[in-house]
Curated annotation (Swiss-Prot):
Organism from which the protein derives: Homo sapiens (Human)
Taxonomic superkingdom: Eukaryota
Entry keyword set: Activator, ATP-binding, Cell projection, Cytoplasm, DNA-binding, Kinase, Magnesium, Metal-binding, Nucleotide metabolism, Nucleotide-binding, Nucleus, Transcription, Transcription regulation, Transferase
GO CC entries: cell periphery; cytoplasm; cytosol; extracellular exosome; extracellular region; ficolin-1-rich granule lumen; lamellipodium; nucleus
Self-association state and partner proteins as the record states: Hexamer of two different chains: A and B (A6, A5B, A4B2, A3B3, A2B4, AB5, B6). Interacts with CAPN8. Interacts with AKAP13. Interacts with ITGB1BP1 (via C-terminal domain region). Interacts with BCL2L10.
Name listed for the protein in its UniProt record: Nucleoside diphosphate kinase B
Subcellular location: Cytoplasm; Cell projection, Lamellipodium; Cell projection, Ruffle
Main subcellular localisation: cytoplasm
Length: 152
């Protein structure tokens, strides 16, 4: 199947604290994507610095790491046709003020510093992020019984 790919999605501490984990998972499942891996953890500062290494020179970097370390996160891997691009559309813009209603950030966020969710921005970054957060044996390979009802 063309463009069957995986993406990394993380529900940030504010999304966990606000009780949005189930709603976010529901949206990805209802879209037809397949959950491949999930863990609930409090990421270390070092782990977060590695995750956000591309932003290390930005003025908001220390605050971002502190915010992401302030509570537990839900790290997930989702698989599906064009899941990276479609997942980003489902999330909405990084700045919730620019997000359309119906997107996760458009429906549940107000400020960019509390935008509840992270999603890989490319297939390449998804591969990097997945390998940073999950060991290969933690990725569960199975065929969803819904697969044939989602894909031609």
């Amino acid at each position: 199947m063309a463009n069957l790919e995986r993406t990394f999605i993380a529900i940030k501490p504010d999304g966990v604290q606000r009780g949005l984990v189930g709603e976010i998972i529901k949206r990805f499942e209802q879209k037809g994507f397949r959950l491949v891996a999930m863990k609930f953890l409090r990421a270390s500062e070092e782990h977060l610095k590695q995750h956000y290494i591309d932003l290390k020179d930005r003025p908001f970097f220390p605050g971002l790491v502190k915010y992401m370390n302030s509570g537990p996160v839900v790290a997930m891997v989702w698989e599906g046709l064009n899941v990276v691009k479609t997942g980003r559309v489902m999330l909405g813009e990084t700045n919730p003020a620019d997000s359309k209603p119906g997107t996760i950030r458009g429906d549940f966020c107000i400020q960019v510093g509390r935008n509840i969710i992270h999603g890989s921005d490319s297939v390449k970054s998804a591969e990097k992020e997945i390998s940073l957060w999950f060991k290969p044996e933690e990725l569960v390979d199975y065929k969803s019984c819904a697969h044939d009802w989602v894909y031609e």
